[in-house]
Curated annotation (Swiss-Prot):
Positions of Mg(2+) 2 binding: G253
Annotated protein name in UniProt: Membrane-associated tyrosine- and threonine-specific cdc2-inhibitory kinase
Gene: PKMYT1
Protein's organism: Homo sapiens (Human)
Chain location of the short sequence motif Membrane-association motif per the record: 382-398
Active site: D233 (proton acceptor)
InterPro entries tied to this protein: CC_SR_Kinase, Kinase-like_dom_sf, Prot_kinase_dom, Protein_kinase_ATP_BS, Ser/Thr_kinase_AS, Tyr/Thr_kinase_Cdc2_inhib
Subunit structure: Interacts with CDC2-CCNB1 complex. Can also interact with PIN1 when phosphorylated by CDC2-CCNB1.
Lineage: Eukaryota, Metazoa, Chordata, Craniata, Vertebrata
Protein family: Belongs to the protein kinase superfamily. Ser/Thr protein kinase family. WEE1 subfamily.
UniProtKB keywords: Acetylation, ATP-binding, Cell cycle, Endoplasmic reticulum, Golgi apparatus, Kinase, Magnesium, Membrane, Metal-binding, Nucleotide-binding, Phosphoprotein, Serine/threonine-protein kinase, Transferase
Phosphothreonine PTM positions: T17, T495
Length: 499
């Protein structure tokens, strides 16, 4: 009887090596670890201005095909304020708002300057209030409420914002309202997100910036945790930059209050920044600290966080890849180890981290570095404006005749604008395509542009113009010289005849 060969024992992890690949007794080859995809640097990509839309449901029939459309009671056409502070919903009032006009409250009360981002959640616009002239950010939901539950879920974000309250490191909510089944949130205007800043930078952020962002975000988390609130979605896309190297924490859509009845129905955020205890359903303030630790690791090392796999497991077992963290200072590495502790009970809290000497007070050299970077950015913009002014003056001095030459009438009358400009609704000052009225068809535009030309017209009446009505009729007799048809071969022979 043949004896079974002894099973190979799994190699135990040594100092400086990542944890074992799995806990199974199946032997793992020594070279198997090299076949697994390791950690990598971030790949260059475009600025993150939007999120991918949600995939459509393929196994269900739209409700509009089963039931006739009807307007629910909460689908108000008039704007109504949304608040969970005990205030009753009331109609919004603004000096520039006229309820009799077809435009919405958003269109009448704000001047839209640009779109900051869009995705499946909705759109965010940079606007200027017509009431006080200040700049704000307005978040508008993409689609109307699908039902009472969907409306309650979207309006819960307003309640989460109101629970946060006022803090210098948290994005401030100005007001919220609903109109026509659409939710609007007006917040203070911040700079780009930390994710957009890193993508524009294209490399690891300087450690001076990292310390400042870490301290400000810890202050925001300490404010939330003191009220029993957990953010559950801390990541670079939800951290917004401000002046002088400061930052603010925003997007409280997944905020949960510990000890409430709805705490069991929480939603996790991005899996790349998820704490390991969330897989067991254990929600606490330590999850935000872990997510912030991965955020700092990503921006300080320009590291691409894995969505899953062995690298995802290693980061949640306390392993920090030395090929990325070798360039960090010993203080920052120690803070990352405290924040990425696998056990949430042993993980450092936001208050404990802020009590460290390296985070107790903002570093003077870090603040000076951020101020110097901002000054250089403004100086570069000023230099470009000055250079453009000098070029304009040089052109005027080199060609003084252009200054003295009077501006006469144009040599040719201006032509009609091209069809593409007339059909382009982006040049209109209206907000939506529906407000443009009946659209112009290409035939109508061409009918208006026929006869319009940039070349000078001759002084002739339409009667003197070329008449094309009889182009297919027979020509009048005697208008062309008569000729006798001949054979082509005979014509060729005549050309060859020397006589």
């Amino acid at each position: 009887m043949l004896e079974r060969p002894p099973a190979l024992a799994m190699p135990m992890p040594t100092e400086g090596t990542p944890p074992p690949l799995s806990g199974t007794p199946i032997p793992v080859p020594a070279y198997f670890r090299h076949a697994e995809p390791g950690f990598s640097l971030k790949r260059p990509r475009g600025l993150s201005r939007s999120l991918p839309p949600p995939p459509p449901a393929k196994g269900s029939i739209p409700i509009s095909r089963l039931f006739p459309p009807r307007t629910p009671g909460w689908h108000q056409l008039q704007p109504r304020r949304v608040s969970f502070r005990g205030e009753a919903s009331e109609t919004l009032q603004s000096p520039g708002y006229d309820p009799s006009r077809p435009e919405s409250f958003f269109q009448q009360s704000f001047q839209r300057l640009s779109r900051l981002g869009h995705g499946s959640y909705g759109e965010v616009f940079k606007v200027r209030s017509k009431e006080d002239g200040r700049l704000y950010a307005v978040k508008r939901s993409m689609s109307p409420f699908r039902g009472p539950k969907d409306r309650a879920r979207k309006l819960a974000e307003v309640g989460s914002h109101e629970k946060v309250g006022q803090h210098p490191c948290c994005v401030r909510l100005e007001q919220a309202w609903e109109e026509g089944g659409i939710l609007y949130l007006q917040t203070e205007l911040c700079g780009p997100s930390l994710q957009q800043h890193c993508e524009a930078w294209g490399a690891s952020l300087p450690e001076a910036q990292v310390w400042g962002y870490l301290r400000d975000t810890l202050l925001a988390l300490a404010h939330l945790h003191s009220q029993g609130l957990v953010h559950l979605d801390v990541k670079p896309a939800n951290i917004f930059l401000g002046p002088r190297g400061r930052c603010k924490l925003g997007d409280f859509g997944l905020l949960v209050e510990l000890g409430t009845a709805g705490a069991g129905e929480v939603q996790e955020g991005d899996p790349r920044y998820m704490a390991p205890e969330l897989l067991q359903g254990s929600y606490g303030t330590a999850a935000d600290v872990f997510s912030l630790g991965l955020t700092i690791l990503e921006v300080a090392c320009n590291m691409e966080l894995p969505h899953g796999g062995e690298g995802w497991q290693q980061l949640r077992q306390g392993y920090l890849p030395p090929e990325f963290t070798a360039g960090l200072s010993s203080e920052l590495r120690s803070v990352l180890v405290m924040m990425l502790e696998p056990d949430p009970k042993l993980r450092a809290t936001a208050e404990a981290l802020l009590a460290l000497p390296v985070l107790r007070q903002p570093r003077a050299w870090g603040v000076l570095w951020c101020m110097a970077a901002e000054a250089l950015s403004r100086g570069w913009a000023l230099w470009q404006a000055l250079l453009a002014l000098l070029c304009w003056l040089w052109h005027g001095l080199a060609h003084p005749a252009s200054w003295l030459q009077p501006l006469g009438p144009p040599a040719t009358p201006p032509g009609s604008p091209p069809c593409s400009l007339l059909l382009d609704s982006s040049l209109s000052s209206n907000w939506d395509d529906d407000s443009l009225g009946p659209s112009l068809s290409p035939e109508a535009v061409l009918a208006r542009t026929v006869g319009s030309t940039s070349t000078p017209r001759s002084r002739c009446t339409p009667r003197d113009a070329l008449d094309l009505s009889d182009i297919n009729s027979e020509p009048p007799r005697g208008s062309f010289p008569s000729f006798e048809p001949r054979n082509l071969l005979s014509l060729f022979e005549d050309t060859l005849d020397p006589t």
